[in-house]
């Protein structure tokens, strides 16, 4: 079984005080809830995609405890980067740390397309839908960042498409941290690529707190699903072979 959950926002290291509990009651005891709920549904042979905002650490060494926490949970994990993952490093450095720390169940979803059971896993971080978004950092080149994410998305989808030729019975899924569509705003360059590669399901995180918002919607034949941890009650959501 494949599962997905974004925005773990872990802060397990001693002296790291970046708990999400200040953001409301739903986050109260969230790391304990995550461990309990994850362990209740995920088996060791399952896979879990984690599309970003994984740890509050500011460097790869600082993220060590959070990575060990994830590694201790059941299942094989596929992690991609979020906007708060300042600890994220190069793939080679991260793999070196995994080997040095005997972290055995974490894989990267980063310019690649892992194959898991019925699915080819693709995606990228994404970016804000519009350069006028209220929360977008100042002084950044919106078009340059979107173009960079488009390149990374194509790298992943090209590898996925090659895998589909060898495994035509599989479905290619897209995972983002940022929503390509949200609250009337659209990141058209990335949406166009999803259509070009015939993606039917796209999962995203990043959104918090607006619990009245729809967590799943269809736009031009693609189903978009919000899978931030607080929307899932900190329990990984299953992805079934049929569309859901």
Model-inferred region functions:
Residues 1-3:
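Extreme N-terminal starter segment of soluble prokaryotic enzymes
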Residues 6, 81, 112, 125, ...:
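Residues at the C-termini of beta-strands that transition into short coil/loop
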Residues 7, 52-53, 82-83, 177, ...:
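Active-site glycine-centered loops adjacent to acidic/histidine catalytic or metal-binding residues
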Residues 8-13, 90-185, 243:
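Conserved catalytic scaffold of divalent metal-dependent phosphoesterases
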Residues 10, 55-56, 180, 209:
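Short active-site segment of divalent metal-dependent hydrolases/proteases
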Residues 11-16, 234:
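Short N-terminal binding/cap micro-motifs at the start of the first secondary-structure element
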Residues 16-116, 186-197, 221-222, 226-228:
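Core catalytic region of metal-dependent phosphoesterases/phosphodiesterases
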Residues 78, 180-244:
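Conserved beta-sheet core of the metallophosphoesterase superfamily
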